Design a protein with these regions (language model features):
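Residues that define the transmembrane beta-barrel architecture of outer-membrane proteins
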Residues: 3-9, 39-41, 89-93, 141-147, ...
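Transmembrane beta-strands of outer-membrane beta-barrel pores
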Residues: 7-9, 29-35, 63-69, 76-78, ...
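Transmembrane beta-strands of outer-membrane beta-barrel proteins
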Residues: 25-27, 43, 57-61, 93, ...
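Membrane-embedded beta-barrel scaffold of Gram-negative outer-membrane proteins
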Residues: 50-52, 58-60, 87-145, 150-160, ...
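Structural signature of Gram-negative outer-membrane beta-barrels, strongest in the C-terminal barrel
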Residues: 2-118
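Gram-negative outer-membrane beta-barrel transporters
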Residues: 18-22, 115-119, 138-225, 257, ...
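Short loop/turn motifs that connect adjacent beta-strands in outer-membrane beta-barrel proteins
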Residues: 22, 51-57, 102-109, 156-163, ...
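C-terminal beta-signal and adjacent terminal beta-strands/loops
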Residues: 219-228, 238, 244-307
């Protein structure tokens, strides 16, 4: 480990204004301190417009400045920390649509689609070294952009029963647009290592009173292990699918609430790698017991359906 520390402070102020019933505007200003260094003032502007009350169709957009100090792990982790890292900074633009509809006591349906575009200087990324461990470094210029889509459907087919479905998909190219570090550098114009371009997930949850059964499926597209994006045996990691299931039970007592959870991870014993030469576990089992004390009196009994 390492014996390092620093004081971190942050402050945020925002102003919100609705000139009309349908239009909303917001400006936020943030500033942070890490150790003895302050970030510049970090502004953000947000707007939303209610296109239609039917279905609660809303258009949203924002522009924000990005500024990120390296974490203590980035700087000092052993082995691999890099105390010479620069700070990330840049701008992000996004826009999207969202909707929400439903019928009380029967179902709710929500969804959103967002386009984003980020231009980041000195992007911090951890990459493998010739010594066998990872170390962070700065990528001079990165253009990260893409589309994110999310949807949620909750159905109550009968009393005490609830079916909850969540789905998401992301297309997120992250391209190195910096300068060549040497004449042989082939990383410019290529996807960043270990960043999948496509990912998706689907979660289904069936709840009955204090019981819940959950199935989660996830997909990650191929990832390159080298900045040159070479299609060699060790130059990329293949796509993989993952399935997990779990059964939960909530118990309620006067002094505490107890959550019991039994999970089967990697249900179909998928062979996959998140990092080159480091195989991930096959099918494995997990038992979780969570205890939440109750402080005060007259606590309402409720079923916590969050994982």
């Amino acid at each position: 480990g390492y014996d390092k520390g620093r004081i971190e402070l942050s402050g945020y102020v925002s102003i919100r204004y609705r000139p009309t019933e349908r239009l909303g505007l917001s400006i936020g200003l943030r500033e942070e301190m890490f150790g003895s260094e302050w970030t510049p003032i970090i502004p953000a502007f947000f707007t939303d417009y209610l296109i239609s009350k039917r279905g609660n169709l809303v258009a949203k957009a924002s522009i924000s400045r990005n500024y990120r100090f390296p974490t203590l792990n980035d700087l000092y982790f052993l082995p691999g920390g890099n105390p010479d890292l620069k700070k990330e900074h840049g701008f992000t633009y996004d826009a999207g649509l969202s909707f929400a509809t439903g019928r009380d006591g029967v179902y709710t349906l929500r969804g959103e689609a967002t386009w984003f575009d980020s231009y980041i200087d000195d992007w911090i990324i951890w990459l493998p070294t010739t010594k066998g461990f990872f170390s962070p470094r700065n990528v001079k210029k990165v253009h990260a952009y893409g589309i994110e889509v999310k949807a949620n459907l909750a159905v109550q087919p009968a009393k005490d029963w609830l079916i909850d479905l969540n789905g998401s998909y992301s297309w997120t190219p992250s391209i190195n647009e910096g300068e060549k570090m040497s004449p042989a550098d082939q990383s410019v114009g290529k996807q960043l290592p270990y960043v999948p371009e496509h990912s998706a997930s689907l979660t289904g949850r069936l709840s009955w009173r204090s019981w819940a059964f959950l199935y989660k499926w996830a997909f990650y597209s191929e990832r390159f292990t080298m900045s040159s994006n070479d299609y060699t045996l060790t130059g990329h990691l293949p796509e993989y699918f993952m399935s997990n299931v779990s059964l939960e039970k909530n118990l309620f007592f006067k002094p505490v609430d107890v959550q019991l959870k039994f999970a089967v991870n990697n249900l179909f014993n998928e062979d996959y790698l998140s990092v080159l030469s480091r195989p991930m576990p096959g099918i494995n089992f997990e038992l979780f017991i969570g205890i939440t004390p109750k402080f005060g009196k007259n606590k309402k009994k409720s079923v916590n359906t969050n994982l």
